[in-house]
Amino acid sequence: MSSSKIAVLYGSETGNAQDFAAILSHKLNRLHFKHTFSSLADYKREDILRCRYLFIVCSTTGQGELPRNVYETVTGDQKNTLWTFLKKKKLPADFLNHIKTAFLGLGDSSYPKFNYALRIIHNRMVNQLGAKEIFDRMEADEQSMAGSNKGTGLGIESVYFEFEKRIITYLMDRFPTRKVGNEIIQREEIDKELYLEPITYLRIDDPHDQQSFSGGPTTFVGDKLIKTGTITLNKRITAKDHFQDVRQFTFESCDDIKYKPGDTVALYSYNTDQSVERMLECQPQWIPLADKPLSFTNGIPTHLLDGGVVQPLTLRNLLKYHCDFMSIPRSSFFLKIWTFATDVTRMERGEEQMKDQRQKLYEFATDEDMQELYDYCNRPRRSILEVMEDFLSIRLPLEYLLDFFPPIKPRLYSISSTANCNNIELTVAIVKYKTILRKIRTGVCTDFISKLKVGDKIRYKIQQNDLIKEEYRSNPFVMVGPGVGLAPLLSAVRSKVSPEMSLYFGCRFKDKDYLHGKELEDMANQGLIKFYPVFSRDRENSPDTKYVQDVLWKFGEEVTNLLVERKGIFFLCGASGKMPIQIRLTLLEMLKKWGGFKDDASAKEYLRSMEKEYRYIQETW
């Protein structure tokens, strides 16, 4: 069976869907099922005609939108993708009837459009183009309150492993044997001790060559969409004694740019030199080769193209600019590295300790409930680097570096500045906290941002989200944004998206984290906006309200009139989890009390109609 007959495709914004798809791909490889593994956007659309078995894992982002790598390739092409092709109206209703398929959606039921992206893809492929499902679509919920794990208390991984089990059982039932040369043999799993070499990997051009690149300038090639900005302001706007450092971060674009309120900036950060040195110390066999020129055996891996590939291509530069070893490892990381726990020379207890480490890494890779992995990695927020420091028996071949470590992905930040202004302003909360291990943790990108100085350069892209529709610019806007959720709303009020804007902002203290408070009060005094701040830990300045939903309820009759009678736009931004759920519940009660809706069902239906009309906008993270 050729690799074009089976495809494992993913649509992933944060990496979860991609990781589960990678685990499935790994399992299929070990069973000798040749297949294509790719994002939906980077899958060659002509291959869909040869494909017979298609497995899709997809998450949902934003307002029930498709992840970007469903409709845009790593090089920024949106015209020649599979999804663009499948949306063509002229395609016949039986266009995909040659394909057997299965779908897994990863979602969070606290969002209004739970697993909406996968449902869009499923509807088009199955209901409209005739693909045949092997089994019913599966949907996993982070909250365990909806989808395939509703009420079970089990996480999304339980749904994934059931999805995987059904696919492998299906394929093994139909293809129990395989052809090797002229012989038909039983299909059996490859020895778990054997590492599966990736299609393309690194090659040391000449390890004995005296040429090396150390400390010289770097450039990036292969991504024409990347832009460069110059830092003009990096100012803390919370009090020094406040627990959170929030920055007013501004950079001037070197190019003419266009963006609207609700659009985001993708920033390309990199690891510190100190963390790179720590990684090299974990793998001392790499040190003599760290600055030697490298090349690829079979072309540049697709995932490196976003942002461009660093030049000169050396191990040190790859670790600094491309390898996200400061991230929390996913189970696919352990699947690939456990077999390389072979170095007994650094074990105090010798071979016995090495075997213990090897066994523990294998358990992290294969444990289906993932509880041990969660306790070891996720709860203490342990990084890949720290895993490598804990398990010194790991001795990784340099050649497969990019198969072991995930790529550093750009981080997305909502724009705060006025539309199309060449001075792009962001409102960034610096991630820094202590874990249960009492260790300080920092975010790779926000730590990078916190250290930038005026005059430094930064690499970025603008991502246009089209959250605010032009036809609604005359409608009233009701905007809710606790904390740094203010960022896109600040862009909206500065850009005057509507002649009638109400802004509900929440923070802890008026004198500590009242972000852009004076500017917003000045706008309110000038009659440009109605501004309703609330301070959850400051009873002196907020005596009768605590959270933004309390202020919404206080002015509930007015807000309901704006949303129902005057077809207003509701724009909610901030942290995902409890906040958006509480806001939505408050709106439902307001609609029943002041909007003329007699029960939950009719109020919920009105909110759904607002979503369909793009009048209910939720941007949470």
UniProtKB/Swiss-Prot annotation:
Record-listed E.C. numbers: 1.18.1.-
GO cellular component: cytosolic [4Fe-4S] assembly targeting complex; mitochondrion
Binding-site residues for NADP(+), renumbered to this chain: S536, R537, T545, K546, Y547, V548, Q549
Single GO molecular function: flavin adenine dinucleotide binding
Primary location: cytoplasm
Cofactor: FAD; FMN
Enzyme class: oxidoreductase
Subcellular location as annotated: Cytoplasm; Mitochondrion
Record-listed FMN binding positions: 12-17, 59-62, 106-115, 142
Binding site for FAD: R381, R411, L412, Y413, S414, G443, V444, C445, T446, W621
Family: Belongs to the NADPH-dependent diflavin oxidoreductase NDOR1 family.
General function of this protein: NADPH-dependent reductase which is a central component of the cytosolic iron-sulfur (Fe-S) protein assembly (CIA) machinery. Transfers electrons from NADPH via its FAD and FMN prosthetic groups to the [2Fe-2S] cluster of DRE2, another key component of the CIA machinery. In turn, this reduced cluster provides electrons for assembly of cytosolic iron-sulfur cluster proteins. Positively controls H(2)O(2)-induced cell death.
Record text on subunit structure and interactions: Interacts with DRE2; as part of the cytosolic iron-sulfur (Fe-S) protein assembly (CIA) machinery.
Name used for this protein in its record: NADPH-dependent diflavin oxidoreductase 1
UniProt organism field: Candida glabrata (strain ATCC 2001 / BCRC 20586 / JCM 3761 / NBRC 0622 / NRRL Y-65 / CBS 138)
Underlying gene: TAH18
